[in-house]
Amino acid sequence: LKLLPILLLATLAIAASAAEKLELRPGDVVAFVGGTDMVRAQKSGRLEAALTQRHREARPKFRDLAWDGDTVYFQGTVGERWRREAFGGWREQLQRVGATVVIAQFGRIESLDGPARLDAFREAYGKLLDELAAGGRRVFLLAPGPFEWPQADASALADYTRAVKTLAEARGLTLLEGDAVVAGGGEPPPALVAAVREKHRLWSDYWRPANWKCLFGDDSKRVFSNATAGLPSFKQEWETFPPLIAAAEARIFNGEAPAPLPLPARSGSADADTAKELAAFKVLDGFEVSLFADERQGIANPLSVRWDADGRMFVACSDTYPQIEPGVKPNDRIYKLTDRDGDGRADASEVFAEGLNIPTGMEVGHDGVYVGQGTEILFLDWKGGRKILLSGFGNGDSHQTINSFVWSPGGELWFGQGDGIESRVETPSGVSSLFQAGVFRLRPGQLQLDAFLDDFMGPGNPWGVAFDDFGQSFVIDGAGGVFHLTPASVPVRRRLRLPQIGKPGGYCGIECLGAGTLPAAMQGEFLVGDYKKNQVSRFAAVDDGAGFKVEWREPLLRSSHRNFRPVDVKLGPDGAIYVVDWYNPITCHQDDFYRHPTRDKTHGRIWRVARKGATHPAPALRTATDAALFEALRSPERWTRQKAK
């Protein structure tokens, strides 16, 4: 992440033969346009801070209109669903922000198409420049930066860079290129960079808000967005951002430190007694349920659990959901829990990561944690490093963003997204797109991202993928149903929708069972979080011709407590089953007010369900020899086999 802004700043020298120098005037508004490299540069704050420092007397404003995955052929800024209806096309958007200057950067991701598409690139870029320059705007072209991925084929990048230079010369435009930092402006001070980052964060929350499907799209008339209980509507709250942005800009030019951030509003259920919730459970015969962790260990609004090879539990929590409050900086967390004495209850809790924003996807691997939040996949390593691996995932609906990360038997990371989402993600092999609902398969080493079920050809809101012992994958739908996705699937757009093999219901979180602590009849069965029914349901996938059908069994766990909301269920290293309890009276995204006062923001539970009398010591895989790890691949414990890989 640090490399991209440095490289981008290093390209900003003025070509001596340019027809016009990059000089900003009083009243100028600079619009940045481009793809992921421009998005990252804006997020870092260093590019804008350097320009601000050099032109402080002119007090220019900066507006980021860059969008991940944007190319000269298609720009999500104007082309994504509901953007044009809400903000208009390029002409309307540039007028709306008052742009007098445009800095555009394209050509890097397009170069992966090779020399054969150079003519199409020149033509499309020319047409886009005509739109950007309309009304007399001054346009500057930024040369394509180098790839940050060693896997990318950069053989045609020089050809596309020359094409951009030729285009600039033919139009008499300034080309920003070379290896100098912004025209001698020097490295901006950290305080200025921090202030610019904060302003940009506010701008992003305004211009590309999470849940904009509920703001401008086909869900804008539902309960989520309406005013209630004396509180503003979603749109009314969104309209409070421009004054916050203006105040942040004033602080930048006055040399003031960023204003203290307001504290988020946090409500909670008045009666959240764990003993009462425990007494409300009915558990499958032969099993018992106990509390592993709750809000006393910091667990509030938990979304998922995973473990590392040492058996430490990681819990992703989000009290930001469903929508960030204006001006508030999200601080969702991942906690690391340890059961040191093996009594089935967490006795140590620490914050592994904070400052997250609705981390709906999480999986442990490769000496760190993969996190999906909003538009990004992050990798958080054990040493405290944080890196954006990929970005450009959609955020049009915060309960349908990328979620439920899980490793496949082949070592790939699978996850879903819902129908309110459009993702266009730049990768070393080009832009990977998924329109509406579907599932992704990521090979982290190559950053190869494949999309399945493009254009809503399966579940409407996938919230869990699980694999049986033969590699067959089963996807559950938060809007209802179970779907089978064959291992032979390829990333193509289907016109025939997958059949639903399981009855409708609100499912969130799925696990395939395989542990010596469980009865033989349960091996290979599946558990799902049936959150609307306040239970953990159980089914078997039975052969049915070339596919499968679902046969439902008696639920593992049921509750008469309306706040019990199982949203993830996983086998642990000890052979017990762990249930993530969101603990909330609110169950639906669109059909409950986004600031509903009864949304519980302070509680959450992790329940442990174990077979009576069954014990299984957690394996010591971190210190195991290679021979022991190979032997662990033969273990009847699915958890052990997966972690041994």
Please name every model-derived segment.
Residues R25, Q42, A183-S267:
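Conserved catalytic region of serine esterases and O-acyltransferases that act on ester linkages
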Residues W149-D179:
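Substrate-gating cap/lid alpha-helix
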Residues L9-S17:
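Hydrophobic h-region of N-terminal signal peptides that target proteins for export
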Residues L1-L8:
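Sec-dependent signal peptide recognition
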